[in-house]
């Protein structure tokens, strides 16, 4: 299945989703279900947000990133990334901030909850959950909220993703608990890196499919190179979808052990 995570429309480039789907098709990857587009599913996220609100688990926050950094770096600042500046505002303070015309973000009242979860690569994990944002000041729903709603709605049982998201998992587990959602199993794998050992990123002009095409590298060879990069075949080997699925399942079992 394919999910287009495009909630922050201010940062999404027009045509980027279509280009990604085209690139996947060119290297022979197909999907069995209709493509899920998060920007078309905001009603589901709004329902989840209202459930949190009904449990008094949300509060308005007007803090800027600069203010949060300054408060957290103070001698007696909070140990977590958000210092709680807006958590217990009085009625008068709330009225003053609302009158300013600035739109607030919405944060959860996590109360420093300790969350434990198991990762099949990294083992047992324990994290303190911060009061993280679930709705941004621009009105966009945050990734943490959308992803747990979508995972549950799509009956996702296993999440396999880059280990840059390992630290985000506790917040998602906390949301799953509050919303009564099923927790999937997690596998966080090392990120794909370039020949300079830097994380592959469009921001850093990493290798693209179009760039490979200009170098006369076929889509089939790009597919083979990608599969070889995670140790599922030799670079010169061409494997079909059935072989790929079988070997991918095997490497997850090896990662777990």
What are these regions (language model features)?
Residues 1, 7, 24, 31, ...:
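Bulky hydrophobic/aromatic packing residues
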Residues 1-77, 163-181:
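N-terminal Rossmann-like or analogous alpha/beta NTP/dinucleotide-binding catalytic cores
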Residues 4, 29, 36, 52-55, ...:
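Generic preference for well-ordered secondary structure
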Residues 17, 42, 65, 79, ...:
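Alpha-helix initiation and N-capping motif
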Residues 59, 64, 167-168, 178-257:
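Catalytic adenosine-cofactor/nucleotide-binding cores of aminoacyl-tRNA synthetases and other
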Residues 66-213:
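Active-site cores that bind ATP or allylic diphosphates and position pyrophosphate for catalysis
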């Amino acid at each position: 299945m394919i999910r287009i995570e495009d909630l922050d429309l201010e940062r999404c480039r027009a045509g980027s989703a279509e280009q990604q789907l085209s690139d996947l098709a060119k290297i022979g990857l197909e999907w069995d279900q209709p493509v899920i587009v998060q920007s078309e599913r905001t009603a589901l996220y709004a329902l989840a947000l209202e459930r949190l609100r009904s449990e008094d688990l949300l509060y308005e926050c007007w803090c800027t990133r600069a203010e949060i950094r300054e408060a957290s770096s103070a001698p007696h600042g909070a140990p977590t990334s958000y210092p709680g500046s807006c958590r217990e505002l009085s009625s008068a303070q709330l009225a003053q901030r609302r009158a300013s015309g600035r739109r607030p973000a919405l944060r959860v009242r996590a109360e420093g909850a300790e969350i434990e979860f198991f990762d099949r690569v990294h083992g047992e994990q324990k994290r303190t959950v911060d009061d993280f944002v679930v709705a941004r000041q621009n009105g966009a729903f945050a990734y943490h909220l959308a992803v747990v709603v979508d995972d549950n709605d799509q009956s996702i049982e296993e999440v396999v993703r880059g280990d840059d998201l390992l630290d985000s998992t506790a917040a998602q587990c906390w949301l799953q608990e509050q919303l009564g959602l099923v927790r999937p199993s997690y596998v966080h794998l090392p990120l794909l890196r370039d020949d300079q050992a830097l994380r592959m990123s469009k921001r850093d002009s990493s290798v693209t499919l179009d760039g490979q095409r200009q170098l006369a590298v076929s889509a089939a060879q790009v597919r083979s190179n990608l599969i070889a990069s995670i140790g599922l075949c030799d670079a010169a080997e061409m494997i079909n979808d059935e072989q790929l699925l079988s070997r991918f399942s095997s490497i997850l079992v090896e990662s777990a052990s």
